[in-house]
Amino acid sequence: MSHEQISLNSDVIESLKEQFAEEQFADNPEPRCPVVLIYDCSTSMWGMDGDDPKMRELMRGHELLQDELVKDLVARERAEISYITYGTQVSEPTLFTTPGEINDIKEAEADPTKDTTHYKYLNTQPVFTDMVTTSTNQALLTAIETIEKRLEKYGSHPHYAPMIFLVTDGMATDHNAPAPGGNQTLLEYTINRLKEHIKFDEKGRPEKGSWVFLPVYIPTGNPKTDADIKKSLSIYPSAPAPEAQPLEPGNILSFFQWISQSVQNRSNSRTEEALAFPNPSNWLMPSM
């Protein structure tokens, strides 16, 4: 039977993922820096013909981020990234993997002498496809739950405060959906869940250990629409920026380089240190 013909049931796949997670800590005792990147893959990101430049640039930025981080000898072992793509539905988050692990998988898959069949079941790379509408709240909740589960896996293993980055081009379509329990809207529930992890002192500065959450949006070029998008995203508590930030069209690659440098700065610091973010001027749209 060829490798392509092998099909595993869900229990075996979960066992493979669990084994992979256990080996991660046995093979690499470094402190971990958990990062979740959330990619809006709704139709507006793809364009009506499915070939919008901003989605092409986002996918190139995704590859650039991995290539940049693997070059940093510290970040490649400490940064752990999970990716979430979303639209009407939210994809299963990819496994938390270090840039070094991703590089090892790519090298193994390029070696015809190695049996890498099991890698396709590990879910380490996002799938980019048109996912229609924009369930941003559900995507954020998925990110929070994914990090919480990862922190449980860490146990006493040293780690940095988690980081979440959201890239979108529009307003959420699930604000008024019912939240679990039915007593709140999904928007209200998401805000409260973020507040559990993003906390500020009396001067409005992020507290020590507070999570990083940065929502960025790609402007449409229509001032009113862009103002509405910014307002809708700025409802969420965020840090280090107090509101959503506009990502200048055409500078998406620069944004991913900025994320890479931010993650490298975090990974090369002590776990209790405040994060020093690089200057965002290369990607931030001015006067927004």
Predicted regions and their residues:
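Acidic, polar low-complexity linker/tail segments
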Residues: 1-54, 149-151, 155-156, 160
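Alpha-helix termini
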Residues: 68-76, 147-158, 194-207
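Von Willebrand factor A/integrin I-like adhesion domains
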Residues: 122-123, 208-288
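Short, hydrophobic/amphipathic alpha-helical packing segments
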Residues: 58-67, 137-144, 256, 260-263
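Von Willebrand factor
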Residues: 29-160, 163-167, 212-226
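VWA/integrin I-like adhesion module and closely mimicked acidic/polar interface patches used
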Residues: 8, 128-134, 138, 145, ...
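Short beta-strand-loop
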Residues: 77-125, 222-236
